């Protein structure tokens, strides 16, 4: 198991919380909670050692296209593909944007 941390610029804190995915379903669980204004903090606990660059590139692609709300994101990964990771993150971002 490896724990990775990432930070990105963000907007204002999100309005809500979200939990998407289940570790046993698609091998990924993502918890999103409001964070500190201007900061997106992501912590990834993964069973895949040596994948930090893959995670960094995925997040950079996602957040280059849009400015995310300020969030603390915890990801529990057991070998999910980048497509599943992006899908779950997009689902979570959609969820925290609703009242």
UniProtKB/Swiss-Prot annotation:
Q: Which keywords does this Swiss-Prot/TrEMBL entry list?
A: Cytoplasm, Phosphoprotein
Annotated compartments: Cytoplasm
Give the GO molecular function terms. acyl carrier activity
* A cellular-component GO term for this protein: cytoplasm
PTM O-(phosphoribosyl dephospho-coenzyme A)serine: at which residues? 25
Which modifications occur after translation, per UniProt?
Answer: Covalently binds the prosthetic group of malonate decarboxylase.
Indicate where this protein is primarily found: cytoplasm
Please explain the role this protein plays, according to its UniProt record: Subunit of malonate decarboxylase, it is an acyl carrier protein to which acetyl and malonyl thioester residues are bound via a 2'-(5''-phosphoribosyl)-3'-dephospho-CoA prosthetic group and turn over during the catalytic mechanism.
The entry's family comment says: Belongs to the MdcC family.
Its name, as the record gives it, is Malonate decarboxylase acyl carrier protein
């Amino acid at each position: 198991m490896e724990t990775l941390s990432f930070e990105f610029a963000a907007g204002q804190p999100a309005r809500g919380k979200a939990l998407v995915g289940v570790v046993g379903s698609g091998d990924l669980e993502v918890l999103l909670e409001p964070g500190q204004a201007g900061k997106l903090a992501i912590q990834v606990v993964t069973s895949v050692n040596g994948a930090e660059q893959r995670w960094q590139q995925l997040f950079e692609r996602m957040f280059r296209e849009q400015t995310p709300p300020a969030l603390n994101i915890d990801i529990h990964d057991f070998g999910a593909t980048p497509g599943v990771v992006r899908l779950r993150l997009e689902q979570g971002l959609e969820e925290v944007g609703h009242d």
